């Protein structure tokens, strides 16, 4: 038994290193060199094919614009102040209750101050009235960075913060700022005039993507009260000269056009659900994404 065990151990040792044939694990040094060389060449070729494929693919991709945009969803519509539960609840006589909302608006509007838009090499005036989309060439680096349209805070009227630092919250007339999320190369198409006949509040303008805020539910519609809109040219929507957006590489200082909405006569001590919606031929809505082309927010002004 012991002799058989010793013989077995000897055979394993001999397999690991055979001193007679100079073999390690059954192969000579030359054999090991050849097999290692084979695998180095084999995996080197695989790596070369992989890297070559990636390089060819990268040649078809622009760093300035996606090659395929047919499946990009229409832009979302969002509001400031940005709140987690989309609920705004405050007491006009209690500054602490609306302090967070005001600070959120102040921080967002910092980049829209005149002092932040003085560089004429970056910013340019695009007019005080809505106009057609402003094309700035192809999506490449040949012309360098593209200029950006200025947007003046004064266009936001009562919601600009220039005359009322509480943006209406102190008076129980809250403001929200609405923006259309950035989508590279997107040019809004306003709805046709006849499609707005069911929305008497909205006036047709071929150079404005209109937005309307109303009560979400039937029981909310009579509680919303008067709604005032403030934007470029006093238009309730987004002017087209701020589009298309050329991306962070070509327009790092891009400013989205804003629309301010003020609710001046909300029913007190009532939670009101309000829906704000953009209207356009290429604006879509989705039940899976509640911010695609629209959003709703609950507002309660407590006494």
Curated annotation (Swiss-Prot):
Region annotated immunoglobulin-like, chain positions: 191-303
Cellular compartment(s): Cell membrane; Apical cell membrane; Cell membrane, Sarcolemma
Keywords per UniProt: Cell adhesion, Cell membrane, Disulfide bond, Glutathionylation, Glycoprotein, Immunity, Innate immunity, Ion transport, Membrane, Phosphoprotein, Potassium, Potassium transport, Signal-anchor, Sodium, Sodium transport, Sodium/potassium transport, Transmembrane, Transmembrane helix, Transport
Keyword field contains Transmembrane: yes
Cytoplasmic side: 1-34
Extracellular topology ranges: 63-303
An annotated GO BP: protein transport into plasma membrane raft
Record-linked InterPro entries: Na/K_ATPase_sub_beta (IPR000402), Na/K_ATPase_sub_beta_sf (IPR038702)
Pfam families: Na_K-ATPase (PF00287)
UniProt PTM: Glutathionylated. N-glycosylated.
Transmembrane segments: 35-62
Cysteines engaged in disulfide bonds, as pairs: 126-149, 159-175, 213-276
Glycosylation: residue positions: 158, 193, 265
A GO cellular component annotation in the UniProt record: organelle membrane
Alphabetized GO MF terms: ATPase activator activity; ATPase binding; MHC class II protein complex binding; P-type sodium:potassium-exchanging transporter activity; protein heterodimerization activity; protein kinase binding; protein-macromolecule adaptor activity; transporter activator activity
Entry note about domains: The C-terminal lobe folds into an immunoglobulin-like domain and mediates cell adhesion properties.
Job of this protein: This is the non-catalytic component of the active enzyme, which catalyzes the hydrolysis of ATP coupled with the exchange of Na(+) and K(+) ions across the plasma membrane. The beta subunit regulates, through assembly of alpha/beta heterodimers, the number of sodium pumps transported to the plasma membrane. Plays a role in innate immunity by enhancing virus-triggered induction of interferons (IFNs) and interferon stimulated genes (ISGs). Mechanistically, enhances the ubiquitination of TRAF3 and TRAF6 as well as the phosphorylation of TAK1 and TBK1.
Family: Belongs to the X(+)/potassium ATPases subunit beta family.
Name under which the protein is recorded: Sodium/potassium-transporting ATPase subunit beta-1
Lineage: Eukaryota, Metazoa, Chordata, Craniata, Vertebrata
Gene: ATP1B1
């Amino acid at each position: 038994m012991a002799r058989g065990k010793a013989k077995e151990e000897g055979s394993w040792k001999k397999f690991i290193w055979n001193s007679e044939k100079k073999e390690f694990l059954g192969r000579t040094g030359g054999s090991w060199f050849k097999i290692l060389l084979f695998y180095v060449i084999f995996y080197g070729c695989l790596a070369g094919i992989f890297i070559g494929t990636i390089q060819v693919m990268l040649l078809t991709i622009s760093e300035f614009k996606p090659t395929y945009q047919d499946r990009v969803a229409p832009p979302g519509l969002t509001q400031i102040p940005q709140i987690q539960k989309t609920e705004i609840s405050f007491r006009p006589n209690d500054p602490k209750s609306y302090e967070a909302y005001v600070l959120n608006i102040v921080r967002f509007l910092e980049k829209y101050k005149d002092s932040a838009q003085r560089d004429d090499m970056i910013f340019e005036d695009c007019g005080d009235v809505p106009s057609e989309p402003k094309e700035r060439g192809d999506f490449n680096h040949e012309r360098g960075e593209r200029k950006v349209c200025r947007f003046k805070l004064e266009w936001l009227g009562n919601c600009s913060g220039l005359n009322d630092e509480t943006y209406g919250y102190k008076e129980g007339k809250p403001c929200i700022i609405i923006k259309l999320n950035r989508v590279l190369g997107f040019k809004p198409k306003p709805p046709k005039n006849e499609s707005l006949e069911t929305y008497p509040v909205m006036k047709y303008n071929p150079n404005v993507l209109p937005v309307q805020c109303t009560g979400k539910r039937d029981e909310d519609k009579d509680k919303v009260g008067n709604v005032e809109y403030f934007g470029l040219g006093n238009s309730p929507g987004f002017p087209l000269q701020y589009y298309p957006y050329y991306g962070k590489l070509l327009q790092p200082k891009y400013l989205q056009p804003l629309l301010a909405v003020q609710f001046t006569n909300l029913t007190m001590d009532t939670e009101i659900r309000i829906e704000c919606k953009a209207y356009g031929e290429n604006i879509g809505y989705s039940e899976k994404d509640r911010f695609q082309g629209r959003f709703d927010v609950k507002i309660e002004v407590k006494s």
